[in-house]
């Protein structure tokens, strides 16, 4: 039976993916959000989903309300619903109920969730009817789907309403310092989540924190080293991607190619292979569809402007920066790697300042954008982007969105734009600069 859903905060990456999925399942979907453009709204607009400014008039009693986690009682629509006792569900609570109708595959972890969810979704949807929610704002819904693949987010323990059949956990790392007190707090959250997985867990076996996880369901370890249950070996990394074999209990279960770069993407693929092997999916089909994976939004997304290679990536944690630069070096071994990074949130920048500097030193040159503050925090003046620049050993400087011309001082470079804020504004400024140079040279 068709329902009408109204999303408060529809441009959020999880919210937009869920909206698209419910729309494709035949439900009427609309939503509201701030007017600022966000990369997720293109998919919503293409689907014909109405995006409204916040207003009490958007809400009618026949609607099911789904509220983004960033929106509280000071939002006029949330306040209206509370005042009139109109029930609503938070995104993660709705998802926890929704997945009960499917055999669900979750992907959790500090880093690599979106890429791994995208890879798992791509393979499974090409084998059988599958619904999915990816953290890049992409969602697909099918009323007949048996399987549901989704991204499981640890922030504020949002994954606690989830009880999936299977879950991958890619790694544990200290992030979200505005919520978690330290690595032990993060690990405890993942341990509580792991206890809710019903059939099997697939965890990276070379992560010391992950090895402390305990759960009633069987735990399968994957990685590169002996002793793991699923081992990736005979690895060849080229400018076309990565080739490798996987063995389980001493037996080779397949030879695989992923058109993706960096060691982290071999691990992501091995996690997907392990999960689908245990779930009884044909490994020959898995190998076929791994070959055709084209990636997810804002994860090593490439474009060429005026013969200049530009990479856009959501990396906003030191571990992710190192992985993204590693991927760029694999694909472009003869080029200078120029990193343009925007720190995301003051709390994360303060907590991980030394680690950010160390990670950015993996690039050949570094440019920094002003820190992007979260809506949840206030700039108390405790950290400036210049503090980060001072700790970077490689050539580095701060640029503004109005003047990105210093980036032109490189002849044979790949430009890697990284961040979770509005780093794309800097990228667009650089693209315009390159386009104008072309016009002036004609």
UniProtKB/Swiss-Prot annotation:
Q: Which SUPFAM superfamilies match?
A: MurCD N-terminal domain (SSF51984), MurD-like peptide ligases, catalytic domain (SSF53623), MurD-like peptide ligases, peptide-binding domain (SSF53244)
Provide the E.C. number(s) assigned to this enzyme: 6.3.2.8
Matches recorded under Gene3D superfamilies: Mur ligase, C-terminal domain, Mur-like, catalytic domain, NAD(P)-binding Rossmann-like Domain
- What's in the keyword line of the UniProt record? ATP-binding, Cell cycle, Cell division, Cell shape, Cell wall biogenesis/degradation, Cytoplasm, Ligase, Nucleotide-binding, Peptidoglycan synthesis
**In which compartments does the protein localize?**
Cytoplasm
**Pathway in which the depicted protein is active:** Cell wall biogenesis; peptidoglycan biosynthesis
Q: Which domain of life is it from?
A: Bacteria
Q: Does the UniProt entry include the keyword Iron-sulfur?
A: no
Q: What does the UniProt record say this protein does?
A: Cell wall formation.
Q: What is this protein called?
A: UDP-N-acetylmuramate--L-alanine ligase
Q: Which organism is it from?
A: Streptococcus pyogenes serotype M2 (strain MGAS10270)
Report which gene this protein is encoded by: murC
């Amino acid at each position: 039976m068709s329902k009408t859903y109204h999303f408060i905060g529809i441009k959020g990456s999880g919210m937009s993916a869920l909206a698209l999925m419910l729309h494709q399942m035949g439900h009427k979907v609309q939503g509201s959000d701030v007017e600022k453009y966000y990369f997720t709204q293109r998919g919503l607009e293409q689907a014909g989903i109405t995006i409204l400014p916040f207003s009490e008039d958007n809400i009618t009693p026949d609607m099911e309300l789904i509220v983004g986690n960033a929106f509280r009682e000071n939002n006029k629509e949330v306040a209206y619903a509370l005042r009139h006792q109109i029930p609503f569900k938070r995104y993660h609570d709705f998802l926890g109920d929704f997945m009960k109708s499917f055999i669900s595959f979750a992907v959790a972890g500090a880093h690599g969730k979106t890429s791994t969810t995208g890879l798992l979704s791509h393979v499974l949807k090409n084998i059988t009817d599958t619904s999915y929610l990816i953290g890049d704002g992409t969602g697909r819904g099918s009323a007949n789907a048996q399987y549901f693949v989704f991204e499981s987010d640890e922030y504020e323990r949002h994954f606690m309403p989830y009880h999936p059949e299977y879950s991958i956990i890619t790694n544990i790392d200290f992030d979200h310092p505005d919520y978690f007190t330290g690595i032990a707090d993060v690990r405890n959250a993942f341990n509580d989540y792991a206890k809710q997985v019903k059939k099997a867990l697939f965890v990276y076996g070379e992560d010391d924190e992950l090895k402390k996880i305990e759960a009633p369901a069987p735990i399968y370890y994957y990685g590169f080293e002996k002793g793991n249950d699923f081992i990736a070996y005979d690895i060849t990394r080229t400018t076309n991607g990565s080739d490798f074999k996987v063995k389980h209990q001493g037996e080779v279960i397949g030879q695989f190619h992923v058109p993706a770069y960096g060691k982290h993407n071999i691990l992501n693929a091995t996690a997907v292979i392990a999960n689908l092997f245990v779930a009884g999916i044909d490994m020959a089909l898995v190998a076929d569809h791994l070959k055709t994976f084209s990636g997810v939004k804002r994860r090593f997304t490439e474009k060429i402007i005026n013969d200049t290679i530009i990479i856009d990536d959501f990396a906003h944690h030191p571990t992710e920066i190192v992985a993204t630069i590693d991927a760029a070096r694999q694909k472009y071994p003869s080029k200078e790697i120029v990193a343009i990074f925007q720190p995301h949130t003051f709390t994360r920048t303060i907590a991980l300042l030394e680690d950010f500097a160390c990670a950015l030193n993996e690039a050949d040159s570094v440019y920094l954008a002003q820190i992007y503050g979260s809506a949840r925090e206030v700039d108390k003046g405790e950290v400036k982007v210049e503090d980060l620049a001072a700790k970077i050993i490689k050539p580095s400087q701060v640029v503004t969105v109005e003047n990105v011309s210093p980036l032109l001082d490189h002849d044979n470079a790949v430009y890697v734009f990284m961040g979770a804020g509005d780093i794309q504004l800097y990228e667009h400024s650089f693209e315009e600069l390159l386009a104008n140079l072309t016009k002036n040279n004609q």
